[in-house]
Amino acid sequence: MNNLFSAKKLLVVVASCMLSTGALWADVNPKPFVVPELKTWTGAEGQTALSGRIVLKNAKLKAVAEALANDYKTMFGKELTIVSGTAKGGDIVLSLKKDKTLGDEGYSMNIGSAVELSAATEHGLFWATRTLLQVSEQHKDGQLPKGKTVDVPEYKLRGFMIDCGRKYIPMSYLRHLTKIMSYYKMNTLQVHLNDNGFRQYFGNDWLKTQAAFRLECDTYPGLTAKDGSYTKAEFIDLQRLAEQNGVEIIPEIDAPAHSLAFTQYKNELGSKEYGMDHLDLFNPETYKFMDGLWKEYIGGKNPVFRGPRVHIGTDEYSNAKMDVVEKFREYTDHYIKLVESYGKQAVLWGALTHAKGTTPVKNKNVIMDIWYNGYADPVEMKKQGYKLISIPDGLTYIVPAAGYYYDYLNCQYLYEHYTPAVIGNKTFEENDPDIL
């Protein structure tokens, strides 16, 4: 009887504990909705009201603080004052800390009595402010949910390409796009600066087929498109704006295919055998022309292309004969080394399975866009030493009204099934270090 009473008493105590614990956990703040999703979240109870101050622990962080203050005012109409010194309740505190686990882009955010943002780099700290803005957007009263996150990206390169060659995209749109990308911690925008239409839609006449090179050019006056282009000053300013927002612009000059803009300008550069959208790789003038074009944009102390990487194209050249395959490989190797001689890292479209040959093509420290496995088998390219960007055309391309690609992305399918480790019909380990 006493044992039964004791058991009942114990059951009541346990039940009471469970109820009180459940109530306790019910008050813990859930993970905030942030894109990309936060890697970790430890919720706490209650909210923190922002004081309206940003406290700097390092003078180097002034630019990050100013960006946060400007964006906060734009979004919410409220001023944030930037100060240094001792933090008070509700302050946003920015600091740097040595933490190898955070890498270049990771950060921590601790919303307690104050909002503490810290990272190993200014870049990482800037991303922390983007998370703070996203959380604030859901709590416009300034009452932020208490809790802590340590957030580190899974992939180094997060972004996309925009085709400004086939269709002119106004500079105002590109500038706005970098801000949108930054808000979601996307860090790379490849700008495709030249391309052309399909001849069959222009009376099968190469000279009438739409083609454009969108950038101001002094080396070859008249090359720049008449239906929309960017001055060099505008393009430099775009890159500066992107840099301020944590985004790298990778400019692309696509050749030796997709090159009708160049051959319309100088007809003798076009291939009579493979079409005028192909540069003639057996003509020495082709190399002189392209060398001069690249020099204009990556040469000198203050080059037009400011970033560490440039894209040299190499997309979809004919492989009809082995002699042209070897010439294509020679061309590819030449322009990898040319841009490297100016201090740039080369990015290129994967084509070396399609153009399989014996002519060596540099692979060390070279990045390859893998868009279609028939052009470049990702397993083989990884073995050869290339760093890969996963951009499978069947899943990630948008070409409105073309019929052979999507008008819109299948967002639900991508969310449920796609990661960068899936490249066409090949699947790699998640976070493979060779997939950027």
Give the residues covered by each predicted segment:
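Hydrophobic faces of well-ordered beta-strands that scaffold small-molecule active sites
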Residues: 158-162, 189-191, 249-253, 308-312, ...
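N-terminal secretory signal peptides that target proteins for export/translocation
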Residues: 1-7
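Active-site beta-loop-alpha junctions enriched in small/polar residues
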Residues: 165, 194-198, 254-258, 315-317, ...
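Flexible, acidic glycine-rich loops studded with aromatic residues
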Residues: 360-366, 373-436
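Active-site neighborhood of glycoside hydrolase catalytic domains
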Residues: 262, 267-366, 371-379, 383
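Acidic, contiguous N-terminal accessory segments
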Residues: 6, 12, 23-153, 346-355, ...
